[in-house]
């Protein structure tokens, strides 16, 4: 790790500031107990930035992110700003421009089922008795969401719309390399998702992935069509390790993997560019309905910080300790409202304190 690691903190809207406060506790421990040299600066973004500065992504925020080594992001958006034109709303006008500006082409979404929380999964207990730990690797800047032409047309009293799925071989190549590299840190398995029996873009996808796989002979590669993959995840999620997906298919698959864990409040995510600059954020939204009530689950935000430590700072052992602190908290029976079966649950700040204590003491 470099001598001083600079992190831009963007709490955002809704529950973002609340759960970010708990991440700050972990950051303090990293500095005080693990002697990490961190430079932390907080910046405004999203709806709160619109309210205060008239724009969702202020220049000061963008500059602060540019001068940092990583971004720890909270959440943006809420009904309060739904009256704005869609392209000026917090989600469209802050997070998407950040991804574009830094060319964050790869999105990682872990989906892990903790044994203590199996009862929350919508999947039958006999299917998930052995748990699962899946990492979705999604290409984020290509595919049908960005392909041209894309339009909606009304002509001769007939209306039609069209989008274009476009993938270049280099886009597939770089995301495939990342998936195989990550598989080497896990169970050495990659399953690539496509629709190569129908789509030309998927035929190219499969060909490039096959070519890349030859550079990783120790990693087992399999392929599934997207329709079969969605079924297999429900039937036996434990069979998967790393899922390699295009933008559209990754959007679908990562949400499916998330929902079968039982609580999206547990799930972190990370997005990278080719220089390993990353944006780390919870997979869930801003949850404005519970904002300010001190009931949000801070685990996704804390695990997002863990991903920053693991992938950004390359400090796997310290990231493992953060992950272990979360696991120990759950094993000891501590719960927030979203993962509790009764009214005996912890507030957001209390859960953060518990995890912080386990991180310091290790038991």
Swiss-Prot record:
Q: Which PROSITE patterns match?
A: IDH_IMDH
Can you tell me which residues bind substrate? 99, 109, 138, 227
Q: Which Pfam families match?
A: Iso_dh
Q: Which domain of life is it from?
A: Bacteria
Q: In which pathway does it act?
A: Amino-acid biosynthesis; L-leucine biosynthesis; L-leucine from 3-methyl-2-oxobutanoate: step 3/4
Q: Which InterPro entries match?
A: IsoCit/isopropylmalate_DH_CS, IsoPropMal-DH-like_dom, Isopropylmalate_DH
For this entry, list what GO says about its biological process: L-leucine biosynthetic process
Binding site residues for Mg(2+) = 227, 251, 255
Q: State the UniProt keywords alphabetically.
A: Amino-acid biosynthesis, Branched-chain amino acid biosynthesis, Cytoplasm, Leucine biosynthesis, Magnesium, Manganese, Metal-binding, NAD, Oxidoreductase, Plasmid
Key word Amino-acid biosynthesis present in the record? Answer: yes
Q: Does the keyword Transcription regulation apply?
A: no
What is the protein's major site of localization?
Answer: cytoplasm
- The residues that the entry says bind NAD(+) are 78-91, 285-297
Q: Where is this site: Important for catalysis?
A: 145, 195
Where does it localize?
A: Cytoplasm
Described purpose of this protein according to its UniProt entry: Catalyzes the oxidation of 3-carboxy-2-hydroxy-4-methylpentanoate (3-isopropylmalate) to 3-carboxy-4-methyl-2-oxopentanoate. The product decarboxylates to 4-methyl-2 oxopentanoate.
Q: Which family does it belong to?
A: Belongs to the isocitrate and isopropylmalate dehydrogenases family. LeuB type 1 subfamily.
Q: What is this protein called?
A: 3-isopropylmalate dehydrogenase
Please give the organism: Buchnera aphidicola subsp. Uroleucon helianthicola
* Lineage, opening ranks: Bacteria, Pseudomonadati, Pseudomonadota, Gammaproteobacteria, Enterobacterales
């Amino acid at each position: 790790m470099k001598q001083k690691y600079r992190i831009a903190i963007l709490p955002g809207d809704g529950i973002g500031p609340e759960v970010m406060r708990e991440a700050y506790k972990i950051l303090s421990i990293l500095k005080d107990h693990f002697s990490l040299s961190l430079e932390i600066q907080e910046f405004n973004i999203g709806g709160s930035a619109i309210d205060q500065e008239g724009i969702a992504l202020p220049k000061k925020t963008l500059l602060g992110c540019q001068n940092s080594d990583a971004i720890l992001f909270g959440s943006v958006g809420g009904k309060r700003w739904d009256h704005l034109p869609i392209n000026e709303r917090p989600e469209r006008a802050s997070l998407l421009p950040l991804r574009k500006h830094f060319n964050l082409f790869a999105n990682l979404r872990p989906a892990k089922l903790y044994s203590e929380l199996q009862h929350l999964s919508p999947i039958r207990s006999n299917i998930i008795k052995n748990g699962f730990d899946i990492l979705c690797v999604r290409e984020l800047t290509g595919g049908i969401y960005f392909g041209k032409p894309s339009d909606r047309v009304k002509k001769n009293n007939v209306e039609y719309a069209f989008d274009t799925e476009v993938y270049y071989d280099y886009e597939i190549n770089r995301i495939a390399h990342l998936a195989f590299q990550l598989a080497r840190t896990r169970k050495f398995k990659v399953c690539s998702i496509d629709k190569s029996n129908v789509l030309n873009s998927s035929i190219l996808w499969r060909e490039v992935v096959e070519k890349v796989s030859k550079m990783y002979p120790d990693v087992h590669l399999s392929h599934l069509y997207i329709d079969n993959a969605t079924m297999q995840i429900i039937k036996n999620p434990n069979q998967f390790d790393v899922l390699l997906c295009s933008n559209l298919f990754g959007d679908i698959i990562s949400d499916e993997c998330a929902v079968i864990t039982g609580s999206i409040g547990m799930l972190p995510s990370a997005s990278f560019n080719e220089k390993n600059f990353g944006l780390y954020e919870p997979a869930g939204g801003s949850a404005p309905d519970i904002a300010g009530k001190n009931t949000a689950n801070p685990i996704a935000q804390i695990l997002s910080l863990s991903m920053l430590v693991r992938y950004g700072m390359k400090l796997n052992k310290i990231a493992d300790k953060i992950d272990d602190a979360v696991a120990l908290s759950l094993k000891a029976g501590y719960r927030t409202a979203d993962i509790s079966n009764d009214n005996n649950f912890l507030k957001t700040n209390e859960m953060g304190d518990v995890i912080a204590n386990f991180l310091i003491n290790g038991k």
